[in-house]
């Protein structure tokens, strides 16, 4: 199990605007509990999510999205993240009406609820697919569980937001804005499958700041392709981002 430590500011608002101030150190574990008894009792720091009527395991589609997101994070950071089935873990991911109407996650913390992710029950998260709202929600909430904050909000290590020119989903999955200058109170306006499929540039910078950068991923010559049917990007034939060096292609 990991423990939580404080994060220092970098004096770069592009990064500091995403840093909550907390991160994990040591081997990070995650799980998909299927019973309220999988959680500590009492659930310190939480809002009784495990014991609320309607508790359920995370939909399989969201579990797949989380696993995919963790694979991405492992590819460009030095974090060590291990799966622990349905058991106790640093990051426990499930569904509860307490999270309605959408979802939320707790920042890393040395208390029962620290790092846990909760999806609400008003949205059909079983519909999660690469590039849609539900899928990107998994990336967003896992980002919180690892120490990322909302890009449009101040607070965190330096009490700054991400600069407005980069506060949108083109640069970070932690933004409430579909495009630069969009309202944060009227919801996203992306097309159905026009949401980020990966962590974006500022997310990667912030995650690497907290957990170290792994430059071995895609460190050789790289060929980038794009599917005009699905919009998915491929690197050397694989739908995975983050060039670690080498020569780019087309």
Question: What do the predicted segments below correspond to?
Answer:
Residues 1-250:
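Zinc-dependent metalloendopeptidases
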């Amino acid at each position: 199990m990991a423990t939580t430590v404080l994060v220092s500011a970098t004096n770069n608002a592009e990064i500091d605007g995403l840093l909550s101030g907390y991160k994990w150190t040591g081997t990070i574990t995650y799980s998909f509990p299927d019973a309220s008894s999988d959680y500590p009792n009492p659930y310190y720091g939480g809002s009784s999510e495990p014991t609320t009527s309607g508790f359920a395991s995370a939909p399989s589609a969201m579990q797949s999205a989380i696993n995919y997101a963790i694979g991405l994070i492992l590819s460009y950071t030095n974090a060590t993240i291990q799966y622990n089935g349905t058991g106790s873990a640093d990051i426990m991911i499930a569904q509860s009406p307490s999270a309605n109407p959408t979802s939320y996650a707790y920042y890393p913390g040395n208390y029962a609820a620290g790092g846990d992710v909760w999806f609400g029950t008003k949205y059909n998260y079983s519909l999660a697919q690469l590039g849609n709202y539900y899928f990107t929600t998994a990336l967003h909430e896992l980002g919180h569980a690892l120490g990322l904050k909302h890009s449009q909000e101040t607070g965190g290590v330096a009490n700054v937001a991400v600069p407005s020119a980069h506060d949108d989903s083109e640069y970070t999955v932690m933004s409430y804005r579909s495009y630069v200058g969009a309202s944060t109170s009227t919801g996203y306006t992306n097309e159905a499958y026009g949401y980020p499929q990966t962590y974006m540039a500022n997310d990667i910078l912030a995650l690497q700041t907290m957990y170290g950068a792994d430059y071995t991923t895609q460190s050789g010559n790289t060929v980038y392709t794009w599917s005009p049917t699905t919009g998915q990007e491929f690197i050397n034939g694989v739908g995975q981002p983050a060039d670690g060096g080498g020569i780019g292609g087309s």
